[in-house]
């Protein structure tokens, strides 16, 4: 049974991919208000045309000032958000360690930069929510790095470290306020996301119905 997200507002950061489409559909079915942020206006228009009842925001999530402005627009139009699913990503690699170029790394690190900006901009929202959720997609390669994917795995490892720091911040804020923990930061690991988009979407929706204290600072392997 799908957990009801009526009254919840969720931001999909970089949500124009297949994973973003699957997540948007699942969230809408569950009753959430969905906002998709991305930098490609054509992809946003196609997504809106296919799903209709969601909001889209054109934004370069790797630009700190642009994300600050995005947060202002979202708050003005929708109020605080209850969830953020970070889907900015991609793969570049191969060629062993010698093939790990700076050019590839700069492209890959955009995902981590976007996560830093978005998670900071909406941190107060998630902490204030009765069920705040931040979720990122990482890789099983973090547990077993390979030379040909060193750039990619380094970015994913940084993503996990940042997400765990967010989790600690959620726990500390609740403890300092003398309140139960209601926000959770979650890491979803995949070997490859292709074919797991629906499962990712379902797991993210289900996370809103799970106990935050149990869920916060956890790694969920979707490849098993």
Regions found by a protein language model. Give the residues of each.
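Flexible N-terminal pre-Rossmann segment of NAD(P)-dependent oxidoreductases
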Residues: 1-12, 212-213
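Conserved NAD(P)H cofactor-binding loop of Rossmann-fold oxidoreductase domains
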Residues: 85-94
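Catalytic loop of short-chain dehydrogenase/reductase
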Residues: 96-116, 127-181, 189-191
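Conserved Rossmann-fold cofactor-binding substructure of NAD(P)-dependent oxidoreductases
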Residues: 62-77
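Conserved glycine-rich cofactor-binding loop
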Residues: 16-17
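C-terminal helical subdomain
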Residues: 172-224
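Rossmann-fold cofactor-recognition segment
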Residues: 50-65
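Conserved glycine-rich Rossmann-like NAD(P)H-binding loop of the short-chain dehydrogenase/reductase
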Residues: 30-46
């Amino acid at each position: 049974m799908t957990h009801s997200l009526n009254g919840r507002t969720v931001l999909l950061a970089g949500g124009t991919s297949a994973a973003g489409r699957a997540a948007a559909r699942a969230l809408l079915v569950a009753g959430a208000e969905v906002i998709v942020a991305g930098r490609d206006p054509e992809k946003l228009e196609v997504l809106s045309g296919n799903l209709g009842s969601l909001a889209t925001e054109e934004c370069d999530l790797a630009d700190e000032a642009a994300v600050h402005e995005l947060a202002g627009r979202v708050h003005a139009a929708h109020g605080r958000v209850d969830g953020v699913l970070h889907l900015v990503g991609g793969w570049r690699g191969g060629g062993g360690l010698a093939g790990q170029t700076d050019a590839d790394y700069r492209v890959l690190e955009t995902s981590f930069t976007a996560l830093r900006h978005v998670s900071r901009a909406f941190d107060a929202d998630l902490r204030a929510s009765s069920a705040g959720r931040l979720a990122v997609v990482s890789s099983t390669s973090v547990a077993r790095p390979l030379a040909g994917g060193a750039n990619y795995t380094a970015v994913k490892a940084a993503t996990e470290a940042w997400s765990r720091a967010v989790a600690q911040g959620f726990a500390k804020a609740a403890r300092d306020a003398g309140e139960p923990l209601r926000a959770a930061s979650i890491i979803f690991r995949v070997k490859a996301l292709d074919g797991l988009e629906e499962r990712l979407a379902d797991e993210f929706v289900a996370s809103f119905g799970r106990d935050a204290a149990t869920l916060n600072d956890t790694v969920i392997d979707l490849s098993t």
